[in-house]
């Protein structure tokens, strides 16, 4: 059983590799229970399906499938670490309130969008193999409105004014290059599960820009 396998591994590490097995970190968990590993929640889900046997009888077959989940506290903690979220309590319920990030207000408009894009893409790239990776849509919602409020605090605008200035459907910041004017858009690629392999990460290439007379903006 699992205890015997653990004992054999411990013996091999001690006698052959001269290493010590940490009892605190080497825990045996029932496959039906959730285990936390590398910031993923891992468990085996019971899937039942009907199959016909060789005699033509229909039988219910149960097969366990390993599931990887994004723990909700992980993406919530990221928001708190970025100071993009305040959690309020009303009638015993948690209310998520996106807030502006004071330490980004002095950055160029282009740098602000790049910062948010890098943080959203970074979390998605880490969890893209999770079965419930789509929950990062909640993370993205808070980040997007935090960005709106950051621009609002910078230019003394309401969210409606910010969206009117930079785009309602596609939020984008204009900047100048040798090839002319370009636009950097806020992340819009979604949060689909990646089945296998490691995809090449999408990043915002840092553009070469021409500054205007406004020292706090790269916008022409």
What is each model feature region?
Residues 1-220:
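Non-catalytic terminal/accessory segments
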């Amino acid at each position: 059983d699992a205890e015997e396998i653990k004992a054999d591994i411990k013996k091999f590490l001690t006698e052959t590799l001269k290493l010590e097995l940490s009892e605190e970190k080497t825990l045996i968990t029932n496959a039906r229970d959730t285990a936390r590993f590398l910031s993923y929640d891992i468990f085996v889900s019971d899937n039942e399906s009907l199959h016909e046997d060789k005699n033509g009888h229909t039988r219910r077959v149960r097969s366990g499938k390993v599931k990887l989940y994004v723990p909700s506290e992980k993406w919530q903690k990221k928001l708190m670490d970025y100071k993009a979220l305040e959690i309020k309590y009303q009638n015993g319920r948690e209310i998520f309130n996106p807030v502006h990030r004071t330490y980004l207000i002095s950055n160029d408009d282009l740098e602000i969008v790049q910062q948010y894009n890098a943080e959203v893409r970074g979390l998605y790239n880490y969890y893209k193999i999770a079965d419930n990776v789509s929950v990062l849509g909640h993370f993205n919602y808070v980040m997007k409105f935090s960005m709106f409020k950051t621009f609002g605090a910078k230019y003394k605008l309401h969210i409606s004014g910010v969206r009117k200035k930079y785009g309602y459907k596609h939020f984008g910041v204009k900047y100048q290059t040798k090839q002319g004017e370009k636009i950097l858009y806020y992340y819009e690629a979604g949060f689909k599960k990646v089945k296998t392999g490691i995809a090449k990460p999408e990043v915002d290439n840092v553009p070469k820009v021409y500054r205007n007379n406004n020292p706090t903006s790269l916008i022409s």
